[in-house]
Amino acid sequence: MSVLTPREIVSELDKYIIGQEQAKRMVAVALRNRWRRQQLEPAIRDEVAPKNIIMMGPTGVGKTEIARRLARLSSSPFLKVEATKFTEVGYVGRDVESMIRDLMEISVNLVREEERDSVKTRAEAAAEERLLDLLLPSSPAVNTSFDTPQTPAGGAENTRNKLRTLWREGRLDHREVEMEVEMQSGPQMDVMTMPGMEDIGSQFKDMFSKAFPPKRKRRRMKVGDAYAILLQEESERLIDHEKVIELARERAEQTGIIFLDEIDKIASSQQGGKTADISREGVQRDLLPIVEGSAVNTKYGIIHTDHILFIGAGAFHYSKPSDLIPELQGRFPLRVELTALGSKEFLRILTEPKNALTVQYKALLATEGVQIEYTEDALEAVADFAQEANQETENIGARRLYTIMEKILADLSFEAPDKSGERIVIDREYVRQHLADITANRDLTRYIL
């Protein structure tokens, strides 16, 4: 659980997300409240429920990124789902409980990876010893003189140490070894199930996998490939899988975050027909018990959703949060509106974040030996073009920068292998030249940018 203060959380989010201070502060408090809840006595701890949030704002303003970065800060299981994928139970589509099963699967993988890291040193040592066992019999150095009783043992040990040194220096990568590997046995079955019965399908697949256990077969492979397989086997052997499931269940229940995107699409609206409104309301009513707190059966056991944090997000162009059914509105007490981005914000997005687009393209082209530099006026021009395109066509927020940067650097990316060793300056004129044919034609702007 993160012990960062709200101010520190906002500071971390500022490294990746520009603007939206109100939304950052709200999610920072929500995350800190989770830590505060863990400090309470058990009697009152169970009574404190998370305050779910609805983020309102056009696409490309940072709604998803805020939630994703928040989950990474707290090492929490995070699931992003589209609310429009769910349908009422009994209709074709996914049932709402599947999101909890998916969250638990993510939590198990997260904890398993952490456990694998914790046993990494021991697993590497064990895998190295097994690899040396495979290498030593095939080593000609083992066939040394047998004049004295001590020589074979001493010679074998010296050879083993030499092989160990050669392996660590990467000088055995060209060698091949023969070893047993698991081969999938039996039919590969995909069990088709009705909505709401995915867990039964999973149990059937587990049953068939036990009925057809994997067989082992001898194969020749490169030393590096053999070591990777041995490392995985040793890691799995050292991990306590029951402990992994127990920790994953606790983390999913206590720190899980589910991001419900496009939640505005399941709200009733003035423009929707009667049938569409009934269908949307049905999905909302199916969501209600999950958000309120219920027990969901998964292949890892029962998962209680009482303390999972739900963050709903949507543009709300044709509907508003008050169009949701009253019971669901009450389960999302916090509302925050994210503001549309302009050229000033676009310029900051291009320069300030650690993972800025400009940094990404610079690193990509550097792999070809091409060094690119951006002038300040070039980035200002990109920001202005992005704002202009958003105003004249659909407003897709910061995602417009991806399209524009790709267009500007398209020729350079294609010719990069032929320009190795060159230094290229991207200035305002360079930007104008590569966007001139599009910006001059409004119709092209609509379709390309």
Swiss-Prot record:
InterPro entries: AAA+_ATPase, ATP-dep_Clp_protease_ClpX, ATPase_AAA_core, Clp_ATPase_C, HslU, P-loop_NTPase
SMART domains associated with the record: AAA (SM00382), ClpB_D2-small (SM01086)
Superkingdom of source: Bacteria
Localisation: Cytoplasm
Residues annotated as binding ATP: 18, 60-65, 261, 327, 399
Cytoplasm found in the keyword field: yes
GO biological process, one term: protein unfolding
Keywords assigned by UniProt, alphabetized: ATP-binding, Chaperone, Cytoplasm, Nucleotide-binding, Stress response
Cited Gene3D superfamilies: 1.10.8.60, P-loop containing nucleotide triphosphate hydrolases
Main localization (coarse): cytoplasm
An example Gene Ontology molecular-function term: peptidase activity
GO cellular component: HslUV protease complex
Function: ATPase subunit of a proteasome-like degradation complex; this subunit has chaperone activity. The binding of ATP and its subsequent hydrolysis by HslU are essential for unfolding of protein substrates subsequently hydrolyzed by HslV. HslU recognizes the N-terminal part of its protein substrates and unfolds these before they are guided to HslV for hydrolysis.
Family: Belongs to the ClpX chaperone family. HslU subfamily.
NCBIfam families listed in its UniProt record: hslU (TIGR00390), PRK05201.1 (NF003544)
PANTHER family xref list: ATP-DEPENDENT CLP PROTEASE ATP-BINDING SUBUNIT CLPX-LIKE, MITOCHONDRIAL-RELATED (PTHR48102), ATP-DEPENDENT PROTEASE ATPASE SUBUNIT HSLU (PTHR48102:SF3)
Subunit and interaction comment: A double ring-shaped homohexamer of HslV is capped on each side by a ring-shaped HslU homohexamer. The assembly of the HslU/HslV complex is dependent on binding of ATP.
UniProt-recorded name of the protein: ATP-dependent protease ATPase subunit HslU
Gene: hslU
